[in-house]
Amino acid sequence: MSPLHRAIHARAGELAPALAAFALLLCLFSGYFMLRPVRETMGIAGGVENLQWLFSATFIAMLVAVPAFGWLNARVPRRVFLDWVYLFFASHLLAFAWLLWRIPDPLWTARAFYVWLSVYNLFVVSLAWSLLADVFDRQQAKRLFPAIAAGASLGGLLGPLAGGLLAGHLGAAGLLMLAATLLLPTLLLRRWLMTWRATDGAGRPGAETEPPERPVPGNPFAGIGLVLGSPYLLGICAFVLLLTCTSTFLYFEQARRVAELFPNRTQQLRVFSLLDFTVQALSLACQLFVAGRVAQRFGVTALLGVVPLLVALGFLALALLPQFAVLAVVMVVRRVGEYAFIRPGREMLFVPLGAQRKYRAKNVIDTLVYRGGDAMSAWLKTLLDAIGLGAALVALVGAGIALAWSLLGWRLGRWHERGITAQEVGP
């Protein structure tokens, strides 16, 4: 075994697929994080006081997109489904590139792009993890997912760096075209991974899995029914809702503070880029050197339960010392924890499930539930501000939510570790 095998806990024959999965996430996140700082400045351009409307618009867009996703999923073989979705989104990136080239600084194009990129991000990432949960079996996922997730963090490092270096030469339209180009290698990687799956992965001879040559059956709303009929999936839904609530509280406070302290758009872009770079660098280090060891020694329970507890402590620190520096540290801890620990742990929860739940139900949770939680949390934060609760009291509310999030994370982790019964999964 090579040092790299040992570093990522790969066994014989697993290094190549782990690297292919790593590269797939690297391409996706490099493209997205080139565009994320652009999205943040566009959100502020419309007014921080209007962010809740953008969150609501994103949720409404999800209400349309999720049934369309389900309709296509029932008609396209699982083996090539990712190709169809990614080519669809690549065409939209090119369309927005043309719009930004023709109309360089329109307010409504900026708002539309903010909403669209929020939809794009969740769909392409959710589908990539659905693919990986389909390719690797339960034990392979537990060993390899933390290292594979490092591809996302490396992409999060390279994306802003490339965006910063190329923005002056290519402009926003050129960056969108480059992001569309980065989707193309993922199609080749998907094909190779599905071939490996049939011989050495979750679909190897003797494994009880559904063949990927057929579409995932069900009507366009089947994913919603699967979620509502499963205590296990409803638990994951509640976990995601609590995650989005803490995230949105911090996000709104960050946007408000950045708008106050850095009124210039160029300064705002630099602040967001610096925060993104810091988050991704720390996430990459944790994914490569910490998360895998935590998963091996303490299991999914630790991946899901510890970070929310740290976020609760961060909210308490904000209540005592409501400074931008403290907020930035809490924001970094939350995002690093999500990328390095919670995301791999959350994806492991889906590995034992069937194809319908990996693709249909998972997509509903990762998109509709996630953005619904964003919208609900945005209006809750707006309500708390409107009734005159100070920043300290809002932070205390956030701490309480984070504690509930931690308790549910421990519960889901223990559920997964002991094995899920058919009754808990649902009919």
Regions inferred by a protein language model and the residue ranges of each:
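Intracellular loop-helix junctions on the cytosolic face of multi-pass helical membrane proteins
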Residues: 1-24, 48, 75-80, 90, ...
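Substrate-agnostic recognition of the 12-TM MFS/MFS-like secondary transporter fold
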Residues: 17-69, 109-165, 212-226, 243-291, ...
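Residue-level recognition of pore/gate-forming positions within transmembrane alpha-helices
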Residues: 59-62, 86-93, 180-184, 244, ...
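Conserved MFS/SLC helix-loop-helix module at the cytosolic interface between two early adjacent transmembrane helices
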Residues: 66-85
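Membrane-embedded alpha-helical segments of multi-pass transporters/permeases
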Residues: 67, 94-98, 157, 184-192, ...
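A membrane-interface helix-boundary motif in multi-pass transporters
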Residues: 77-81, 162-181, 274, 299-303, ...
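C-terminal ends and interior cores of transmembrane alpha-helices
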Residues: 87-106, 309-323
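C-terminal transmembrane helical hairpin of 12-TM major facilitator-type secondary transporters
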Residues: 302-341
